[in-house]
Design a protein with these regions (language model features):
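Short, solvent-exposed loop/turn and secondary-structure capping segments
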Residues: 119-122, 168-170, 234-239, 300-301, ...
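Non-catalytic, conformational "gating/processing" segments within enzyme and secreted inhibitor domains
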Residues: 41-48, 93-94, 133-294, 313-397
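Extracytoplasmic/secreted cell-surface and envelope-processing proteins
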Residues: 116-122, 297-300, 329-331, 384, ...
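Internal alpha/beta scaffold segment
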Residues: 293-314
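Hydrophobic alpha-helical segments of integral membrane proteins
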Residues: 16-17, 327
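Extended hydrophobic
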Residues: 223, 275-291, 398-431
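Detector for small/aliphatic-rich hydrophobic stretches
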Residues: 2, 6-12, 19-186
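Short, solvent-exposed amphipathic alpha-helical segments in soluble enzyme
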Residues: 304-307, 390-391, 428
Length: 431
């Protein structure tokens, strides 16, 4: 069998901004080097949190073992609903890729420092009606579930040495999110950018080397999430059946593409007039769902009907024709999230995030950006994405199942055991 690799990296970064350093708000002791640390007891284990002092780089902070229980259906249903809500706010002819799983995790980590108004707004936009404790436990379980061979998710927190990281937040980040934590000199923006980009590169096997170019003025904290996949197809595409210069009938007219063919037994179904086929990976822990809507229906609208209905697919002989494609996307999501109900947590709202830092500051989400890349070919798939959240001081043959994607279609990568939607891509045009 020819191995077809998928490599997908999702990086979410949270950037906090303020105009003035806060006075230290926690008790602390100087260590032998004159640096200060605070220790908070959480579940019987001491968790080091940062306080105002000299920058020390990455700290040796160890959290509790991840919870290996089952991720709840309520939790994954929320992520999948969030994925669809984002899609509904994109243009019907949008072509691109994004990762709801990684974006949801970094936003849910941010929620741990939110006040009541900000938290309620974020929960509405994230479609999640769970306590912080339940959210944290399920994220711990998701990290554990995604920790198998070929899949990895990681988090990091970078804090300005002029500010004190809230001890309770530090414990949550370490115990439930396995976040690597460090203190840095944010007055030296280039050094912080280099440290952040090195962390991203290290946690994506070098596939994303530069998430940040520069830091906006008054940045005081970064929260980063990385999701990395490197898996082989269980059934490979036929290398001898790669057809060049065929027409893809996009919404902007016909474009010449290369189509790859695969035959064999797949899980597939006709749902609401369209076709869905599932492509499993060798570890049986993830699959890609390819959704071909009925004529005249956009991939966005069709995903709204079929997302989460993968269990309707049944085994049968099938044939898939899938384009070789490379997509690059950039989404500025602040106004999208505002439209989804997150306004009170965003710049201009009345919500605050007092639980992130021991600082007397009024902090809000100032920007949310996601950039993503996916490359699908007969030899493999590489996918990469970066997301930033800036926190600022407030102010059809009957007897043969054929899926021929020579017109707009969609792709979804799903973690089988948890049903978590890892990546979503829609293709309306191919340039």
């Amino acid at each position: 069998m020819k191995l077809i690799k998928i490599a997908a990296m999702m990086i979410c970064a949270l950037m906090l901004f303020s105009c003035a350093p806060a006075s230290p708000g926690v008790d602390h002791d100087a260590d032998e080097n004159g640096k200060t640390t605070n220790q908070q007891e959480d579940n019987g284990k001491l968790i080091n949190s940062t306080v105002k002092g000299e920058p020390s780089g990455w700290l040796d902070i160890k959290g509790e073992p991840l919870d290996n229980g089952e991720v709840s259906d309520e939790f994954t249903s929320a992520t999948n609903a969030f994925a669809l809500a984002l899609l509904e706010n994109l243009d019907d002819d949008w072509t691109g890729v994004y990762s709801p799983a990684s974006l949801a995790m970094v936003l849910q980590l941010t929620m741990q420092g939110a006040d009541e108004k900000a938290r309620a707004a974020m929960a509405e936009a994230l479609h999640i009606d769970m306590t912080n404790d339940d959210i944290n436990v399920n994220n711990s379980r998701l990290l554990s579930a995604l920790g198998s061979k070929g899949i990895n998710m990681a988090n990091a927190v970078m804090v300005s040495s002029e500010y004190a990281l809230n001890g309770n937040f530090a414990a949550i980040a370490a115990n439930f999110y396995r976040a690597e934590t460090g203190t840095f000199d944010f007055t030296d923006g280039r050094s912080v950018v280099d440290s952040a980009n090195k962390w991203v590169s290290d946690h994506t096997n070098g596939r994303i080397k530069q998430l940040f170019e520069t830091l906006p003025k008054d940045t005081l904290m970064l929260l980063i999430n990385a999701l990395d996949l490197d898996l082989n197809w269980k059934t490979s595409f036929d290398a001898e059946k790669v057809y060049k210069d065929l027409d893809f009938h996009g919404t902007n007219g016909d474009q010449k593409v290369t189509l790859m063919a695969a035959k064999g037994e797949f899980l597939c179904a006709e749902i609401d007039g369209g076709k869905v086929i599932l492509l499993p990976y060798e570890n049986d822990e993830c699959f890609m769902a390819v959704a071909l809507p009925p004529e005249g229906v956009s991939p966005n609208a069709y995903l709204g009907k079929v997302m989460g209905r993968w269990n309707e697919c049944k085994a049968r002989e099938a044939e898939l024709w899938l384009p070789k494609i490379e997509l690059n996307s950039r989404l500025e999501l602040l106004e999208t999230l505002r439209a989804m109900g997150m306004g009170e947590a965003l710049l201009g709202g009345s919500g605050n995030f007092p639980g992130l830092l021991d600082a007397d500051e009024f902090i809000q989400i100032g920007d949310v950006i996601q950039a993503a890349h996916i490359n699908v070919n007969e030899n493999g798939t590489q996918a990469a994405a970066g997301s930033g959240v800036a926190m600022k001081r407030g102010i059809s043959l009957e007897d043969k199942f054929v899926v021929r994607c020579d017109r707009p279609y969609a792709m979804v990568i799903v973690h089988t055991a948890t049903n978590e939607t890892l990546f979503v891509a829609t293709v309306n045009n191919i340039e």
